[in-house]
C-alpha cells in the first residue's frame, strides 16, 4: 500500500520484517511476472533500538496522563481535517495534550502549521503544547497514548511501549493503487483494531472517556507483546540474523570464486 509498484523489483534478496511480508512479495512477483527473490525473516533493528532505549529510560509518576497527537502528512491528515474538534474534546479533560506534526508537514506546509499554533496562542488552559523541535523522539515514548491517523510513529509507539493507540480513520495513505490486487490485507489495516481503538474524524464525542478506559486496560500490554512476537521476526536479535545471512553469502561467493 505504501511502496510503489516495482520498488523491490531489482533486489536479489530481501531482509523482511516478518513472515507477513513473504506472501505480499510472492503475490506481487506473480502478478507482475517478476523473478522470485530470496526472502529472509530478519526483523526490525530500528524498532529494537527504540525498545532498548525506552527500557533504559526511567519513568516518573505523573499527575496527568500525556496524550500525544502525532499525525502523518498525507492529504486529509488530522491537522488538515479535524484538529480543532479533536482538541475541543481533549482539552480541559485532565490530560496534557501535545501536538507533534510530522516533520514533512512543517517542511511543506509551514503556513498551515503556523496558523494552527496561532489559533491557540491565547489559550490559557495550561494543558496544550506544540512540539516543533524534531531533534529527538523522547516525547513520543514518554506519552501515555498516541493519537494518529496513518503515521508509522503510532505503531512504533505501540510496539515499543506496549501501550494502545487511538487511530483516527482519515483517508488512508495509498502510494500504490495496485495494493488491492494483492489478497493479503495491509498490516496498516489489520492492526488498527488490535492495538487500540478507531474513531471517525467527525465523531470525537466521548473520546476522552475512551482514552481513560484504554489507559486503565492492562490487558493491552500482553496483547501487544503477543502481536509483536507474531509479527516481528527475531525481536531482539535481528542484527545477528541479518549479519549471519550476509556472512554466509560472502562465504558462498568466496568459495565460488575458488572453483
Regions found by a protein language model. Name each.
Residues 1-52:
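Active-site and donor-binding regions of nucleotide-sugar-utilizing enzymes
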Residues 7, 60, 139-140:
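Structural alpha-helical scaffold elements that stabilize or flank donor/cofactor-binding regions
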Residues 8, 36, 145, 150-231:
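Catalytic binding pocket for nucleotide-activated donors in carbohydrate/polymer assembly enzymes
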Residues 12, 65, 141-144:
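Conserved acidic residues
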Residues 17, 42, 100, 168-170:
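Generic beta-sheet signal
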Residues 40, 44-119, 201-204, 215-216, ...:
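Conserved catalytic-core segment of nucleotide-activated headgroup transferases in glycan assembly
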Residues 111-155, 160:
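Donor nucleotide-activated moiety binding/catalytic core segment of transferases
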Residues 235-259:
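C-terminal alpha-helical cap of glycosyltransferases
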